[in-house]
């Protein structure tokens, strides 16, 4: 049984999925077995009914969710991005499952866990990118501050270049330029 699980786990689309597969154990309860087999059959019908469907990304956000339970904690931008990816995947899967012609009632427990919050999803998209950088579009204040910093940076470079032009040529490197 363990070897079979290990083989199936190699096909998981995420580390979290792989861990869940490896944690499965046989059951002697006929009702549990029937329920699980029905769920697997419904999943197969879903995948076979939508040939171009592919598994959506499911980042492991357990750490971020754990942080969110602690008052005053702050997420790193990359964690926020990953939560946005999970929200997007959840919304899209929910739409695909609800829109399936068979209805797939066996997957009702999964559907109940899925979340759709487009406003939050869009807010996250405006706030951070896929590399975990906070974007100017995260807030108007941030955009103004960054624009002022860029302006100040340019002003300092111009001032240093003007000072550089007053230095005698014998002290200046031929390809010299000002960088900060």
List each language-model region with its residue ranges.
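Extended, Lys/Arg-enriched charged tracts that mediate electrostatic binding to polyanionic substrates
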Residues: 142-180
């Amino acid at each position: 049984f363990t070897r079979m699980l290990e083989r199936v786990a190699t096909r998981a689309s995420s580390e979290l999925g792989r861990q869940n597969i490896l944690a499965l154990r046989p059951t002697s309860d006929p009702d549990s077995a029937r329920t699980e087999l029905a769920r697997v059959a419904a999943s197969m019908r879903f995948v076979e009914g939508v040939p171009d469907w592919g598994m959506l990304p499911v980042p492991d956000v357990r750490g971020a969710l754990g942080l969110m339970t602690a008052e005053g904690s702050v997420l790193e931008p990359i964690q926020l991005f990953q939560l946005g990816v999970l929200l997007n995947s959840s919304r899209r899967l929910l739409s695909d499952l609800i829109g399936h012609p068979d209805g797939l009632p066996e997957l009702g427990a999964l559907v109940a866990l899925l979340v759709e919050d487009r406003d939050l999803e869009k807010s996250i998209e405006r706030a951070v990118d896929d590399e975990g950088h906070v974007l100017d579009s995260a807030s108007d204040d941030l955009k103004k501050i960054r624009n002022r910093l860029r302006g100040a940076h340019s002003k300092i470079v111009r001032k240093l270049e003007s000072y550089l032009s007053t230095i005698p040529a014998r002290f200046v490197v031929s390809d010299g330029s000002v960088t900060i």
